[in-house]
Each structure stands twice: as structure tokens, then as C-alpha cells.
Amino acid sequence: MCIRDSIYFARPDSEIDGVGVYHSRIQAGRYLAQDSPVEADLVVGVPESGNAAALGYSLESGIPYGTAFVKNGYVGRTFIKPGQSSRESSVQIKLNVLKEAVKGKRVIMIDDSIVRGTTSDRIVKMLRDAGATEVHVRISSPPFLWPCYFGTDIPEREQLIAYNRSINEICEVIGADSLGYLGEERLSQMVQGLPICKGCFTGEYPMKPPTRDIRGNFER
């Protein structure tokens, strides 16, 4: 299966081969707290797929979990919007920050991924504008380093923010105080050993990928 189903695409109340998606995301958050700890006052998730991982981080670290974002239910997922401009505008329309929840606090922001960096820098800025004194970003998946050829809109490597950048450089680009990713070795653990495709993280695909990009340019 595509590990992105458990991380992002699937509903939290669904199961994949008997393994609950909600449980997998909670576990990812726990692993993040173990492997990438930081002192803070509040853990928040970027809705919706970041919420369970944020709860897991809170349970493992003992840092309180809270709600920082109000989501506009009429806006779809920004990751699968067809163009860069539509992704950027959707972020601003999709989320509002609860200022009273984050003002004066050191915030850990949990999200499911950083692909192009379109949403992360804007959400970090929203938290700072709302009064957060620090914003520490934790991602419940490894860095995206390779494209997907099998159905997910993960573009050529040059469009991926992690391509040819260190974690510190990505942290600077998105404007966070610190940045941590889930380790690649944790992916199998979070889904209890189910066979998974993690080619977008490792470059190792379950079948030989095409030698050229056959997806075309859908952003024109």
C-alpha cells in the first residue's frame, strides 16, 4: 500500500488491512516526540491529518494538546490543488488561527508533510502573527525527496522543498524555530509491519518507475 494513505489520504476512522489509521497517526506523533523533542507550551495539529499525530506527540511528551486552527470546511485539501497559485490562496481561506490559544506561547505545530513548502511557511507566519513566541514544526512523515509515478501529485524533484536542502535550510525557508521529521525507519512501525510503498521518501519503488516523467504538466 501507499504509506501516504495512512499519513494523509485516508479518513482517520478507516482501517487499512486491519490497522486503524487513527492509531497509526497517533503512533507517528509518539515517535516524533521520542525522536525530535523540544520544550514548548502547546502542541497543535494542522487539520485534519495533523490532528491525531499532534495528540500522539502530546501524550508522549506531556505537553498540552490544544486547538489552534479553525478550518473552513468548504475548502478542499491544498496538497491536491492543480496549481501553485490556487494552493497558496486556499491556505489563506482554509485556516484561521485562534489567537487566544497561541498568544504568548511556544507552539509545536504538527503537520503530515512538507512537499513544496506552499502551506508550511504561511501557516508558521499565521501562528507568529497571532502572537506565538516560538513555532517548532514537526512532520509526521520523512522528507519528500522523490516524485511519485503511481497516482499521487508529487512533482519532479526540483519542485520538492527537501531536494538539495538540509533540514536547517528547510527550517529557514518556512520560518520555523526548529524542524523535525519522522524517521523513515518508523514508517513500517506505525502501520504494524504492513507492506508499504515509500518510494517518495527513499527512491525505492515496488516496481520499476518510468525513465521519463509521463504525467505531463497539469498546472498550465
Label each PLM-derived region with a short phrase.
Residues 4-220:
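PRPP-associated nucleotide enzymes
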